[in-house]
A protein has these predicted regions:
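Conserved small/polar residues in nucleotide/adenosyl-binding loops
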Residues: 133-135
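Active-site catalytic microenvironments in core metabolic enzymes, especially phosphate/sugar-handling
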Residues: 1-4, 8-26, 30-33, 37-131
């Protein structure tokens, strides 16, 4: 029975540019979450993909957030500059070019953390400097 439904059970993938156009046309439709499964560190990917971030910038999307992007170089740069300061970044895309090129621009350092937090389980071991930056 499942075999007969296999085509109906396939995910409907949409180009991120089309999603951004839809979201920008319907800003009051509620929260939109983009999940880039191809850059999932739980599956062994580097977690430094910039495709979604670059699409948000290109679409002039307001209110977007990239949850996690592994970039120790930019985190160190943000920590050196301090909260409230602006830094010139080359964010993400440093492991390879499969998940997007580095995003270059000015970024405001919003907040910093030393990476200490409570988590039970094998993940997140060795997390160090964290930063929240706003790309302009």
């Amino acid at each position: 029975m499942v075999w007969k439904l296999r085509k109906d059970l396939q995910p409907q993938l949409v180009k991120i540019e089309d999603v951004m156009a839809f979201v920008n046309k319907h800003p009051d439709e509620g929260l939109t979450i983009f999940a880039d499964g191809s850059d999932n560190p739980g599956g062994g990917a580097p977690c430094d993909g910039t495709v979604a971030l670059q699409a948000m910038i290109d679409a002039n999307f307001k209110g977007g957030l990239v949850g996690v992007l592994f970039d120790p170089e930019t985190a160190r740069q943000a920590h050196a500059a301090g909260v409230g300061n602006t830094i010139q970044v080359r964010l993400g895309g440093k492991t390879d070019n499969r998940h997007g090129d580095p995003v270059q621009g000015k970024a405001l350092v919003k907040t910093l953390s030393n990476g200490d937090f409570t988590y039970r389980g094998p993940m997140f071991q060795g997390v160090k400097d964290l930063s929240l930056i706003h790309i302009r």
